[in-house]
């Protein structure tokens, strides 16, 4: 099935570019984010951050020039208003947080890691759904097929694909970001921990433990998702504090 964003851009799988196969860490997130625009009509901002295109790279750090390229490509009919780049803080925040609060403290660069998501495509979150119902549906006659986050984020076939990427990366260390990679990936191979709170309760936040996957041995570290540690949207102050202490202890 072909999925599309509002205003018609295709939803693409966003995956790591296979630039080398000797990475130090394999980092697994949840699902791909998107390029966001500001939607203005009759001089008023009606949606400050509408997802309209797939990011150009996994854990993208934002780029107004690229956002403008997307806007030019959409070429919105003026009867629907106009699109402008969303605030810089709303494009690529997870990617910037990943660099600043995960890679930098570990003295890693993007060249040292292989990035992956349980679901490599963007999905509609409740905020996007609300905005579309209020301002798009029945008012803009450009079809879209933007599915919500599924109950099962990664099925068995997707887990197999992730394992293939893991082996391709050459990494022997794995970082899992948040509850979902524990639930949908780690628990296929090790059921010691069910969620990040279990990790933290055992004083294992940010500490490596061994896991065997497909006969290969890895060191796994579980950390909170950048949404939590970077205070991006809905988040729990607890995980920022826990993550801050982890950084201080490195």
In which residue ranges do the predicted regions lie?
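Short, well-ordered beta-to-alpha junction loops that form the rim of enzyme active sites
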Residues: 30-32, 118, 176-181
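Active-site and ligand/interface coordination hotspots across diverse enzymes
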Residues: 1-104, 161-165, 209-216, 242-250
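Feature marks short, surface-exposed loop/turn motifs that line or immediately flank catalytic pockets
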Residues: 34, 122, 230
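Short, surface-exposed acidic-centric catalytic microdomains
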Residues: 59-67, 88-142
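Hydrophobic/aromatic beta-strand patches that form the interior of the parallel beta-sheet core
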Residues: 26-28, 114-116, 173-175, 219-221
